[in-house]
A protein has these predicted regions:
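Conserved PLP-binding catalytic core of the aspartate aminotransferase-like
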Residues: 270, 282-314, 330
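Phosphate-binding glycine-rich loop
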Residues: 63-103, 121, 301
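PLP-dependent aspartate aminotransferase-fold enzymes
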Residues: 79, 91-133, 139
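N-terminal "arm"/small-domain region of PLP-dependent enzymes with the aminotransferase-like
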Residues: 1-56, 143-144
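PLP-dependent aminotransferase class I/II
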Residues: 201-281, 285-288
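PLP-dependent enzyme catalytic core of the Aspartate aminotransferase-like
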Residues: 164, 309-314, 319, 323-353
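Active-site phosphate-binding strand-loop segment of PLP-dependent enzymes
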Residues: 126, 130-186
Length: 353
């Protein structure tokens, strides 16, 4: 770091993203991207005519996308705010609803950016341990007196709470915002969007990166009552008014409209997840009951970090977290059937099955 860095940032530990190799030699099962390309409707929407309009700023109100999203989710446009990836939605929410005297509560094993953002913005953390089996006890979050963020389904475990459990947390914290990060909800979770009109303290965040094949476009949505969304827009228009580029606005709108492609690709991933889990368990792995587009697995036959390295040597990238309680586990993105068969073949060679 330079001698000019603010003292407030010197102890911040940045987030470590998954590896993004710039060549094609790896089977990439490490960052929970979709193995399928964007919808053909997206390719049509991002036309030459739209590219030529890149000389112009994008619509800061994101009106066309909001109208499409409102119709899709059964909400009003004023109940939705697009973000430059759901990370921006989440960051804006923490900026709006937390500060040095208003902490953020989250699980000890969950999406790593929550803790990073707390460090960046000097927000106190209330870290709530998951149970020994990595499940979350909703009653641990009752009456906390803090803003709460829940990844549901959780990452990296893939486990999910039913909507009724989230509703219990909402009822037990009427004076605090409860943020539900639904990045993986389309693969088997139960969305809390239907609860938005019932709970003024509920903010739901979703992404286009997983089930809608737009990780590289960076688009997310925050959804809640109109006053919460107005709070987020206060942050947005104080920081980054043109936060969604023109091509992403068009791509996101087209992705929402092509429900048939969404259903087909989602079903394919869920089916592949099912038989991959069975194959891993047949090889002696412990595999959690994922409701996401990845599996969280471990084996007593080899340390998680060592297995990650051996797989990488064989051209297969998975995610290993060198962290308490989960160091022996791997997070494995669900790819195409051929990619998962290649993973299993590599594991057989490493473990000498």
């Amino acid at each position: 770091m330079s001698r000019f860095l603010s003292e407030r940032l010197m102890n911040v530990t940045p987030y470590t993203p998954g590896e993004q190799p710039q060549d094609q030699k790896y089977i990439k099962l490490n960052t929970n991207e979709s193995p399928y390309p964007p919808s053909p409707a997206v390719l049509d929407a991002v036309s030459r005519a739209e590219v030529e309009k890149l000389r112009l700023y994008s619509d800061p109100a994101c009106a066309e996308l909001l109208n499409t999203a409102a119709k899709h989710f059964g909400l009003k446009p004023s109940q939705i705010m697009p973000g430059n990836g759901s990370d921006e939605n989440l960051f804006f929410a923490l900026r709006a609803f937390c500060d040095e005297e208003h902490p953020l509560a989250y699980a000890d094993i969950t999406y790593g950016c929550y803790g990073v953002w707390c460090g960046l913005m000097h927000i106190p953390s209330r870290i709530i341990p998951l149970k020994a089996d990595f499940t979350l006890d909703p009653t641990d979050y009752y009456g906390l007196g803090a803003t709460i963020v829940l990844a549901n389904p959780n990452a990296p475990t893939g486990l999910a709470l039913p909507r009724s459990a989230i509703e219990g947390i909402l009822k037990a914290n009427p004076d605090n915002v409860v943020i539900v990060d639904e990045a993986y909800v389309d693969f088997g979770g139960e969305s809390c969007v239907p609860l938005i009109d019932q709970y003024e303290n509920l903010l739901v965040v979703q992404t286009f990166s997983k089930s809608r094949q737009l990780a590289g476009a960076r688009l997310g949505l925050a959804m809640g009552n109109e006053k919460l969304i107005a709070d987020l827009n206060r942050v947005k228009f104080s920081l980054n008014p043109y936060n969604i580029n023109r091509l992403t606005l068009k791509a996101g709108q087209a992705a929402l409209e092509d429900t048939a492609y969404f259903d087909t690709t989602r079903a394919a991933i869920v089916e592949t997840r099912g038989w991959t889990k069975q194959e891993l368990e047949a090889r002696g792995f412990s595999v959690l009951d994922s409701r996401s587009n990845f599996l969280f697995a471990s084996t007593v036959r080899k340390d998680g970090g060592e297995l990650y390295k051996k797989l990488k040597e064989k051209g297969v990238l998975v995610r290993h977290f060198d962290a308490p309680r989960i160091g022996s586990w791997l997070r494995i993105t669900i790819g195409t059937p051929d990619e998962m068969r290649a993973l299993l073949k590599a594991l057989d060679e490493i473990l000498e099955v």
